[in-house]
Amino acid sequence: MIQEAIYQVINKQDLDLDKTIQVMEEIMEGRATNAQIGSFLTAMRMKGETIDEITACATVMRQKCKRIHPEKDVLDIVGTGGDEANTFNISTVSSFVVSAGGVPVAKHGGRSVSSKCGSADLLEALGINIALSAEQSAEILQKIGMCFMFAPTYHASMKYAAPVRKELSVRTIFNILGPLANPAGANMQLLGVYDENLVEPLARVLLNLGVKRAMVVHGHDGLDEVTLCNTTTICEVSNGNINSFFLSPEQLGFSRCLLKELVGGDPKKNASIALDILNGSKGPKRDIVVLNSALCLYMSYNQITLRDCVKMAEQLIDSGAAKAQLNKFIELSNSFNQEVK
């Protein structure tokens, strides 16, 4: 099937849902060669992935992954990566703020692929044990309202595509799929994308996948976050509907900054930035965490304005609640002796 699909995609023909599912199953079950996987990913990138194709691939990834089953609705804050901006880990730091505000966050990520420091790299540098089983992560989520699910632990079937993806070293559909395959079945999501042309399509994919509330965002400066440097395009999924709008920093009382003011570095550097923010340091790095956290809080609470959510995020940092959440996570994650290889 994958050979037939490669021919079709090379000729700029879209795949239907069923055929894409079959191809993705071949890849995830180790029935496709590295050459076939590389050809398929490259051809799909050049053609451009459709909503049906992305939905099909995400559906297979969700079916193949190890799952945890939260008792409550959970949220994921995640970016596709690939924006080449080398900012610090904005969404990961925001996770501590949002979960401190009573919104369960099931963060899903891995090590660096397109940046100097992935979410897993940052959390390790902060002293968090990421080598946990699904059961252990579920227990932490239940106790403190936050967990981190290290992607390789949950997506064993990705081992067939991972080497090809690393060798290609370009954006592929897998940059898009990771954020769509949360093992906790997160039904609320702030999803940042590297290309404005992906904003509405991925909102429709999330709708297809049954997500309850989501915002797909792209900064006009190229960031896969809600940005402080420019306007952000946002596509909101709510109650089965999709609504698109633009958001500028000024609308929520923020001053714009330069992109270079948001740049991070290696895990040690980004851990230092994260601690500075959680310890109350002011400036653009804090502001962009507050901004992204506010949108997550807004999705999670009814009858509250975005400006109110900005104030809430600021209070969660200034009161020490977000830092306390980090400390709880460090303590609980290191209380387990079992390691997942």
UniProtKB/Swiss-Prot annotation:
Keyword Metal-binding (UniProt): yes
GO annotations of cellular component type: cytosol
Enzyme class, UniProt record, top EC level: transferase
Keywords, comma-separated and alphabetical: Amino-acid biosynthesis, Aromatic amino acid biosynthesis, Glycosyltransferase, Magnesium, Metal-binding, Transferase, Tryptophan biosynthesis
Molecular function (Gene Ontology), one example: magnesium ion binding
Keyword Amino-acid biosynthesis: yes
Cofactor: Mg(2+)
Residue ranges of the TM segments: none
Positions of anthranilate 2 binding: R165
Binding positions for Mg(2+) 2 per the UniProt entry: D224, E225
UniProt protein name: Anthranilate phosphoribosyltransferase
Positions bound to anthranilate 1: G79
Pathway field: Amino-acid biosynthesis; L-tryptophan biosynthesis; L-tryptophan from chorismate: step 2/5
Entry EC no(s): 2.4.2.18
Residues that hold Mg(2+) 1 according to the record: S91, E225
